[in-house]
Amino acid sequence: MRAIITVMGNDRTGIIAKVSGVLADIDVNILDITQTTMQGIFTMVMLVDISKCSVEFEAFAGILEQAGRDIGVVISAWHEDIFNSMHKI
C-alpha cells in the first residue's frame, strides 16, 4: 500500500530530515521524492510505502500533521488511490 505526502511552507534547515526521521520511526519507506524551493517557499511531494507502517493510516496522517506544526510547515497525507482519483481529469 502506498501514500502521497505533500509538504509546504517557508524554507528552513531540516525539513527533509524531520519528515524522513518521522517516517523511519513508524516504518514507512520513501519510494520517490521531489522537492523544490520557489522564492523561499519549500515544496515537497513524496511517494511512500505504508505496507509495514507501525500505526493505522489516521494516526500516520496525524503524526505527520503534528510534525509539520512542530517545524512550521503544512504536511498532508493521502492514500495513493484517493489522491489519484482526486487528481483525475
Segments and roles (model prediction):
Residues 1-89:
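A conserved regulatory-domain signal marking ACT and ACT-like small-molecule sensing domains
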